[in-house]
Amino acid sequence: LNCTETSFMTGDLRLRAVEHFYDFHPISAQQIFDAVAARGIAREHITEEVLQRHDQDHYGGTAAVDRLMGEAGVTAADRVLDICSGLGGPARYLAWKAGCQVTGLDLTASRVEGATALTEAAGLADMVQFRQGNALALPFADAAFTLAISQEAFAHIPDKPALVAGIARVLQPGGRLVFSDILSRERLGADDARRLFDGMRFSEIATEADYRGWLHAAGMHVVSATDLSEEWTRILVERHAMYRSLREQTVARLGLEHFERYDQAYEHFVGLYRSGVLAGALFHVRRNG
């Protein structure tokens, strides 16, 4: 799905494009299993500690999850929802480290299947489960969770007012939402917005002020918002270099055209961080009541 007229795309079409994007993402469950095997570790000997080197497909690895856990004050009593859980690295890490129950939700069936396979291999299937579903129509009962988390995923989702309203519904009163996301410092120009969607499937990138308004309207309040822009700029430069280092594997699995298209998109994305157009933050939010 390569849609240049992104301003005319409906929310459903945007979500379909995101789903397709992650079906062909260079990091997959098979790639992780292959990396573990290359270390000489048999599948039956996989543990959470083994996977941590490979399965944290977000900015900052386990250190970022530790920071999120510190903000949230995660305990074994928490019922955690990981929204846009991908291959499940943070969900497994939370359950392993805090002893809590975690439910991961992701739009893309192949990510849910991969997350489930990795979780079973790590022996954590009794603590972590994954479901396919739409974050704009959360398939959970009211007040089902004490904590919701997400990392650099809401940028993919259109209609963020509906997103945060749905999260507020499934949190119990006083429940926490702790998430990091890609932000714009000011409203993005049309060309940058189009290129970010076409290349990275980022949809309607928000400002910090946007989020504060939407969260307030949904009956939540921001406890803190930590600026991560400088740290992420450094990380993104490193991730782009890592992607290029996987050229041979990516071309073999997805083809040269796919590799080059994603490489160009990532170069544009990193450039917007280096120039200060894009930013990032970790939000700690509470549901009122």
Question: Regions from the language model: what does each represent?
Answer:
Residues 136-147:
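A short acidic, Gly/Pro-enriched loop at the edge of an enzyme's catalytic core
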Residues 161-176:
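A short glycine-rich, Lys/Arg-flanked "PGG" loop and its adjoining helix->strand segment in the class I
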Residues 182-202:
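Short, glycine-/aromatic-enriched active-site segment of Class I SAM-dependent methyltransferases
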Residues 204-219:
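Short alpha-helix
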